[in-house]
C-alpha cells in the first residue's frame, strides 16, 4: 500500500519562478501636429482632386509605418471634402482605409480597392509610379525634412573638384528638396550640377525622372555624370543607376551621410548575371505573376510565353500572392522563375532562400539568347518596361519563321547514322561545364498516332474499331516526352517520372495483393482463430 501523503502535493511552480508575461508593445501614436498633418499628407490638394474627379468612394492606401496617421488623415480629409459638399448640397462621400497592402506597397493595390468598390485610390508614401490597369490614382508622396548645410558639406567633402558633373535626384519623399540642393551647389561653384523632376516613365534613363537641362542630350551624354541619390534607394533602382552613370553616391537620411555603394552594387550585378546563366540551361520556366494592378501585365505575360516557346522551352504561369521560398519550392518541376511586376518589385532582393533562381523579364531575354549572341554590356532593367510590347506582329512572325527554319536545318540527319535530336549541337551549362540534355524540352520527340493520317477503319456497323478507340494509349519510346492532347508536357513527364508521391492511391502500386483470410472472432474471455480452435 502506498504511504499516505503528509502534505498537499506541489501543483505549481516554485515561488521564485513567477510567471512573467512580457509587456505588450506600446501602441504607436501620431506625433504630427494638425498643421503638419495637413501639409505632409496634402489634404487640400487631395480633396480638390477628389471633387474635380467626382468620385464618391475613395480608398486610402498607406504603407505600414504611416498607418498610425490613418485615422487622423481620414478625419481631416472628410472634413475638407464635406465642407464644400455641404455648401453645394452634394451627397456624402465614403472613405475607406485599405488593409493588407504591405506586399508590393509601391504599387496601387487595385484588388483591395475593388473589395470596397472604390472609384479612386489615394496612394501615400513612396511609389513606383507604374500605370494602373483599371482605377485612377492620386499620389501623395509626403515630405521629410533635410538638413541642407550638412548635405552640402557631405557633397563638398566627396567632390573637391568643382568641375565635376553631377546629377542630383531624390526619393519621392525628398523630391521637394532637389532644386534647393542644386541651387546651393551652384552657389558653391558646382556649375555642372543639374536637377531632376518627377515624370511617370519607368523606361526613362532614370526611372520616373527627367533630367532638367537647357539642351537636349541623348543617354550617352549623361554617362559622364556622377549621380547623387538623396535617401536610400531600393535595390532595383541601385542597379539601374549603377549601370547608367559614371559613379553612384547615396546620401543616407535622416542624418545625411554620403556613401559610395559601388562595390556592393557590382557584387549584386555579378550575382544577377550568375542567375541569368542558370536560367539559360533551364528547360521549364515559371512565369510568376507578382502584380495584378500594373497596366500591360497581361500582354507582358503573353510576350514572355511566346519568347520562351520560341526558345523551345516550356512555360507555366503561376500566381501565388506574396512570394516566399516555401511556396515556390512546391513546384519542383520549375527550373527557374521570371517575375512579372513593376520595375521595383520585379527584383526579389532577399532571394538566398529560394531553391530556384528568380530573375526579371530583361534578364530572361538575355538568358534566352544563344551562346553566340549572349552579350551583356552591363545594362539592367527591373520590370516589364523593356519587353517591347509594341513590336509589330509581322516582326514577331518573321522571327518565329526564322526560328523554325533554323530548327529544320539544325535537325537534319547527318552522316554516320545520327538522326533527329541526336544531330543537334550539344549544349553545356556555362557555370559547371556539364552537358545539358533538357534545356530545350519542346524539341524532344512526342509520340504521334500513326493512324491519324490513315483512312478510318470501320466495322460492319460503321463504328470505329476498338483499336482506334484506344489508340491514344500508346507506349512511349525511350527519350520521348509525356504529352497531353498531343502537346509535349514536361510537367506531366515530371509527374510520371520525377515525383515520389503522385496522389492518393499511387502509393499502393508496389504492394502485393493477398487473399482474404478469416480473422479472430469471439469475446474477451476466449477467441476463436479460424479452424485452430479456441484461445
Swiss-Prot record:
Essential cofactor(s): [4Fe-4S] cluster
Keywords: Cytoplasm, Iron, Iron-sulfur, Metal-binding
The UniProt record lists the keyword Metal-binding: yes
UniProt xrefs under InterPro entries: DHP2, DPH1/DPH2, DPH1/DPH2_1, DPH1/DPH2_3
Region of interest (Disordered), ranges: 390-471, 512-535
Residue ranges, compositional bias (Polar residues): 449-471
Residues binding [4Fe-4S] cluster, per UniProt: 107, 128, 342
Compositionally biased intervals (Basic and acidic residues): 390-401
Sample GO molecular function, one term: 4 iron, 4 sulfur cluster binding
Compositional bias (Acidic residues): 404-424
The keyword Cytoplasm is annotated on this UniProt entry: yes
Main location: cytoplasm
GO cellular component, one term: cytoplasm
GO aspect biological process, one term: protein histidyl modification to diphthamide
Cofactor binding summary note: Binds 1 [4Fe-4S] cluster per subunit. The cluster facilitates the reduction of the catalytic iron-sulfur cluster in the DPH1 subunit.
Subcellular location: Cytoplasm
Pathway(s) the chain acts in: Protein modification; peptidyl-diphthamide biosynthesis
Subunit description: Component of the 2-(3-amino-3-carboxypropyl)histidine synthase complex composed of DPH1, DPH2, DPH3 and a NADH-dependent reductase, predominantly CBR1.
Biological role stated in the UniProt entry: Required for the first step of diphthamide biosynthesis, a post-translational modification of histidine which occurs in elongation factor 2. DPH1 and DPH2 transfer a 3-amino-3-carboxypropyl (ACP) group from S-adenosyl-L-methionine (SAM) to a histidine residue, the reaction is assisted by a reduction system comprising DPH3 and a NADH-dependent reductase, predominantly CBR1. Facilitates the reduction of the catalytic iron-sulfur cluster found in the DPH1 subunit.
Family: Belongs to the DPH1/DPH2 family. DPH2 subfamily.
Record's protein name: 2-(3-amino-3-carboxypropyl)histidine synthase subunit 2
Originating organism: Gibberella zeae (strain ATCC MYA-4620 / CBS 123657 / FGSC 9075 / NRRL 31084 / PH-1) (Wheat head blight fungus)
Gene name linked to the record: DPH2
Amino acid at each position: 500500500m502506498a504511504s499516505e501523503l503528509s502534505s498537499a502535493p506541489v501543483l505549481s511552480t516554485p515561488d521564485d519562478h513567477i510567471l512573467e508575461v512580457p509587456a505588450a508593445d506600446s501602441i504607436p501614436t501620431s506625433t504630427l501636429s494638425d498643421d503638419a498633418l495637413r501639409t505632409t499628407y496634402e489634404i487640400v490638394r487631395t480633396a480638390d482632386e477628389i471633387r474635380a474627379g467626382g468620385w464618391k468612394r475613395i480608398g486610402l492606401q498607406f504603407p505600414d509605418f504611416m498607418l498610425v496617421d490613418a485615422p487622423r488623415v481620414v478625419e481631416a480629409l472628410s472634413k475638407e471634402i464635406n465642407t464644400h459638399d455641404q455648401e453645394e448640397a452634394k451627397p456624402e462621400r465614403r472613405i475607406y482605409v485599405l488593409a493588407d497592402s504591405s506586399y508590393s506597397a509601391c504599387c496601387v493595390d487595385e484588388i483591395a480597392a475593388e473589395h470596397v468598390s472604390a472609384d479612386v485610390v489615394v496612394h501615400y508614401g513612396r511609389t513606383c509610379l507604374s500605370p494602373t490597369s483599371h482605377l485612377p490614382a492620386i499620389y501623395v508622396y509626403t515630405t521629410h525634412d533635410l538638413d541642407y548645410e550638412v548635405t552640402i558639406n557631405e557633397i563638398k567633402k566627396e567632390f573637391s573638384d568643382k568641375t565635376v558633373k553631377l546629377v542630383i535626384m531624390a526619393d519621392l519623399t525628398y523630391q521637394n528638396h532637389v532644386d534647393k540642393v542644386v541651387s546651393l551647389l551652384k552657389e558653391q561653384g558646382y556649375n555642372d550640377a543639374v536637377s531632376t523632376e518627377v515624370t511617370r516613365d519607368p523606361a526613362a534613363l532614370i526611372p520616373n525622372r527627367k533630367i532638367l537641362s537647357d539642351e537636349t542630350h541623348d543617354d550617352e551624354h549623361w554617362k559622364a555624370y556622377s549621380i547623387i541619390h538623396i535617401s536610400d534607394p531600393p535595390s532595383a533602382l541601385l542597379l539601374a543607376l549603377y549601370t547608367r552613370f559614371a559613379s553612384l553616391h547615396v546620401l543616407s537620411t535622416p542624418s545625411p551621410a554620403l556613401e559610395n555603394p559601388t562595390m556592393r552594387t557590382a557584387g549584386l550585378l555579378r550575382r544577377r548575371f550568375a542567375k541569368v546563366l542558370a536560367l539559360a540551361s533551364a528547360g521549364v520556366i515559371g512565369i510568376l505573376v507578382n502584380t495584378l494592378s500594373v497596366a500591360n501585365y497581361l500582354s507582358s505575360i503573353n510576350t514572355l510565353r511566346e519568347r520562351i516557346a520560341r526558345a523551345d522551352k516550356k512555360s507555366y504561369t503561376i500566381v501565388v500572392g506574396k512570394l516566399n521560398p516555401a511556396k515556390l519550392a512546391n513546384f519542383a518541376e520549375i527550373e527557374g522563375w521570371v517575375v512579372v511586376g513593376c520595375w521595383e518589385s520585379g527584383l526579389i532582393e532577399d532571394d538566398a532562400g529560394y531553391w530556384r533562381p528568380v530573375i526579371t523579364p530583361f534578364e530572361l531575354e538575355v538568358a534566352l539568347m544563344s551562346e553566340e549572341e549572349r552579350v551583356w554590356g552591363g545594362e539592367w532593367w527591373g520590370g516589364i518596361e523593356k519587353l517591347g510590347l509594341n513590336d509589330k506582329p509581322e516582326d514577331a512572325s518573321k522571327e518565329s519563321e526564322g526560328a523554325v527554319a533554323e530548327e529544320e536545318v539544325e535537325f537534319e540527319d547527318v552522316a554516320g547514322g545520327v538522326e533527329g535530336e541526336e544531330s543537334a549541337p550539344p549544349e553545356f551549362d556555362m557555370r559547371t561545364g556539364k552537358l545539358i540534355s533538357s534545356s530545350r524540352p519542346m524539341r524532344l520527340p512526342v509520340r504521334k498516332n500513326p493512324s491519324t493520317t490513315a483512312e478510318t477503319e470501320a466495322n460492319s456497323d460503321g463504328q470505329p474499331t476498338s483499336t482506334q478507340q484506344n489508340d491514344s494509349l500508346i507506349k512511349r519510346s525511350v527519350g520521348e516526352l509525356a504529352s497531353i492532347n498531343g502537346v509535349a508536357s514536361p510537367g506531366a513527364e515530371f509527374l510520371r517520372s520525377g515525383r515520389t508521391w503522385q496522389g492518393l492511391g499511387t502509393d499502393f502500386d508496389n504492394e502485393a495483393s493477398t487473399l482474404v483470410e478469416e480473422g479472430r472472432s469471439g469475446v474477451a474471455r476466449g477467441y476463436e482463430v479460424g479452424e485452430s480452435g479456441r484461445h
